[in-house]
A protein has these predicted regions:
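Alpha-helical interface subdomain recognition
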Residues: 1-83, 88, 100-105, 112, ...
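Short glycine/proline-enriched turns and hinge-like loops at secondary-structure junctions
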Residues: 64-65, 132-134, 158-162, 176-179, ...
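Short Gly/Pro-enriched turn/cap motifs at secondary-structure boundaries
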Residues: 86-87, 113, 128-131, 155-158, ...
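Well-ordered alpha-helical segments within folded domains of soluble proteins
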Residues: 89-94
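Short beta-strand-to-turn element immediately C-terminal to the catalytic PLP-Schiff-base lysine
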Residues: 98-101, 141, 167-171, 184-186, ...
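A short, Trp-centered hydrophobic/proline-enriched beta-strand micro-motif
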Residues: 116-124
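Flexible, small-/acidic-enriched active-site or ligand-binding loops
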Residues: 135-137, 188-219
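A short core secondary-structure module
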Residues: 146-194
Length: 351
């Protein structure tokens, strides 16, 4: 396996890093304190090619791979996890569509995303169904050449700004996971009711809402794949997107470590920087170790899917490890900064 990034990947990393440093970091505090949705930042990310990177060239897209997404994601999450979540949410919504949709759907809904700024949302999670996707209760009943959708979704990123949703439904409740079907649903369709914006720690400017579908009529041709294939398509989408989710934790952890190093080198106690105390320096060394390990897990999972290998196990391991690693490093960063670690005037509190 080649561990070095290609020249194109290095350029992509540098582009994302520059954008995070110049466009995201300076605005992160404002958006976290106000909760204002960073629409202008998202539009700039779209303009320079950091969004929708997996759309196929035949639909005017860049056709990039999952490793490219991982490279971009680490830098954007280093800048601000909430803004990165909003910027990269399209990837999750697009994944099942790119995997399972026919060309008509891609021309109607996907190709326009390369021509003008548009957002999409992945509407799968429900109050009683998160990782247990087969437990969804949202229904879709066929009536003529339409399906009528009823049900509720929750924790839907970019819901209030999305132009369309990928919605997972049950078309045959008696068939278990084989009775699940996905649809693309235009957000302007009558019967869609938006819930209130949720205010989440570290994610205050990300637009996360519940969605209720009341007799929402969707043309049958907007079905993703065939009836009953929704669960399989959704699981395949997770294999593609979990490395990108996991690397977000690496980016946040890296930011926490850098803030810790900066503070530990400038904060003096008993006549010397606290970095010279082994209790601090060992803690930061462990941060660096775990960040490197997490990044490699993400790269491995992305490389596997890019090269035709099933990565379900590796992607799940990466997501599990990186989430716990990030939580631990951010907690340690608060300890390094002491009282400043949980003060809103300092960046570690938000992480």
């Amino acid at each position: 396996m080649e561990f070095a990034l290609s020249s194109e990947q290095k350029e992509l990393r540098d582009l994302a890093r520059k954008f995070a440093k110049e466009e995201i970091r300076p605005k992160a505090e404002h958006h976290d304190h106000t909760g204002e949705y960073p629409l202008a930042v998202l539009k700039k990310a779209w303009e320079i090619g950091l969004m929708n990177i997996h759309i196929e060239p035949r639909f005017n897209g860049a056709g990039m791979q999952e490793l490219d997404d991982v490279i971009i994601g680490e830098e954007l999450f280093w800048g601000c996890s909430a803004m990165a979540t909003a910027i990269l949410a399209n990837n999750l919504a697009l994944a099942p569509v790119l995997l399972g949709a026919n060309d008509r759907i891609k021309k109607e809904f996907v190709q326009p995303m390369t021509e003008e700024f548009k957002l999409a949302a992945y509407a799968v999670t429900e109050p009683g169904a998160g990782s247990d996707v087969a437990a969804i209760r949202t229904s879709a009943k066929k009536v003529g050449d339409e399906y009528i959708i009823n049900g509720s979704k929750m924790w839907i990123t970019n819901a209030g700004y999305a132009d369309w949703f990928f919605v997972l439904t049950k078309t045959d409740p008696s068939a278990g996971h084989k009775g699940i079907t996905g649809f693309i649903v235009d957000s302007k369709t009558p019967g869609i009711i938006m819930g209130k914006k949720e205010i989440n720690m570290g994610q205050k400017c990300s637009d996360t809402r519940g969605i209720t579908f009341e007799d929402v009529k969707v043309p049958a041709w907007q079905m993703i794949g065939r009836e009953g294939e929704g669960f399989k398509i959704a699981m395949g989408a997770f294999d593609h997107t979990r490395p990108g989710v996991a690397i977000g934790a690496v980016g946040v952890a890296r930011a926490a470590m850098e803030h810790s190093i900066q503070y530990a080198n400038t904060r003096n106690t008993f006549g010397r920087p606290i970095m010279e105390n082994q209790g601090i320096s060992f803690m930061i060394a462990e941060m660096a170790r775990d960040i490197e390990a997490g990044r490699l897990l993400c790269y491995q999972a992305a490389w596997m899917i890019d090269n035709g290998f099933r990565n379900t196990y590796q992607a799940s391991i990466a997501k599990m490890f990186c989430a716990d690693m990030c939580m631990r490093i951010c907690t340690d960063a608060v300890q390094v900064l002491g009282g400043y670690g949980f003060n809103t005037e300092y960046p570690v509190e938000k992480l």
